[in-house]
UniProtKB/Swiss-Prot annotation:
Family: Belongs to the TRAFAC class TrmE-Era-EngA-EngB-Septin-like GTPase superfamily. EngB GTPase family.
Annotated S-S bridges: none
Annotated Gene Ontology cellular component terms: cytosol
Binding site for Mg(2+): 40, 62
Protein name: Probable GTP-binding protein EngB
Gene that encodes the chain: engB
Positions contributing to GTP binding: 33-40, 60-64, 78-81, 145-148, 178-180
UniProt keyword annotation of GTP-binding present: yes
PANTHER family documented for this protein: ENGB-TYPE G DOMAIN-CONTAINING PROTEIN, MSS1/TRME-RELATED GTP-BINDING PROTEIN
Cofactor(s) the record lists: Mg(2+)
Transmembrane segments: none
Gene3D superfamilies: P-loop containing nucleotide triphosphate hydrolases
Species annotation: Legionella pneumophila subsp. pneumophila (strain Philadelphia 1 / ATCC 33152 / DSM 7513)
Lineage of the organism: Bacteria, Pseudomonadati, Pseudomonadota, Gammaproteobacteria, Legionellales
Gene Ontology terms describing biological process: division septum assembly
Length: 200
């Protein structure tokens, strides 16, 4: 089993916009996804710290960019959840603008972990986010979350469907199933992150 270097993640800061982020150097990997895709749960599972990222029953609660430090050069970035219907349109547009700005401007960004509920993958905003990333040739790893909610064969079919959808970009897009509840897929995620962060 890979050594989990992510269990030493500590909260660094929150930022409302890109110009409030730390210096653009080192390594960042960003976690993004629709509200209620299980992003906070996945981060807590990865870091083995159930209190690291705030989980909420109210989708859209995380409106800030939250950064967690792994060491002096490496950070995990929790981007605001998107796509929740009950949030005011101007707030939604502000979020989308910040997401786009972060993905386009941040030079230290090494990859995007995009979380989708395995039961409802490939929503419009998910595809927009992947397209933004591909536009700057940024690797995207899609985590199909809540895999414990479906049978094994249903999960396998969902993974295959998303892989096929992005087969023309397979050099940049990878896909896996993930369950925070059962901790399924954690080792695969850690192996990928280790490559992106270039741990020596």
């Amino acid at each position: 089993m890979p050594i989990n270097l992510y269990s030493k993640a500590v909260f660094l800061k929150s930022a409302a916009r890109v110009n409030q982020l730390p210096e653009d150097s080192g390594y960042e990997v960003a976690f993004a996804g629709r509200s209620n895709a299980g992003k906070s749960s996945a981060l807590n599972c990865l870091t083995n710290n159930k209190n690291l990222a705030r989980t909420s029953k109210t989708p859209g609660r995380t409106q800030l960019i939250n950064l967690f430090s792994l060491d002096e050069q490496r950070r995990l970035v929790d981007l605001p959840g998107y796509g929740y219907a009950k949030v005011a349109m101007e707030v939604k547009l502000e979020w989308q603008k910040n997401l786009a700005h972060y993905l386009e401007a941040r030079q230290c960004l090494r990859g995007l972990i995009l979380l989708m509920d395995v039961r409802h993958p490939l929503k419009d905003l998910d595809q927009i986010l992947v397209n933004w990333a591909l536009h700057r040739e940024l690797p995207v790893h899609i985590l199909l979350t809540k895999a414990d909610k479906l049978s094994r064969s249903e999960v396998k079919n969902a993974v295959l469907k998303v892989r096929q959808y992005y087969e023309l970009a397979e050099h940049l897009v990878s896909v896996q199933a993930f369950s925070s509840v059962k901790k399924d897929g954690v080792e695969e995620l850690i192996s990928l992150l280790d490559r992106w962060y270039e741990w020596n």
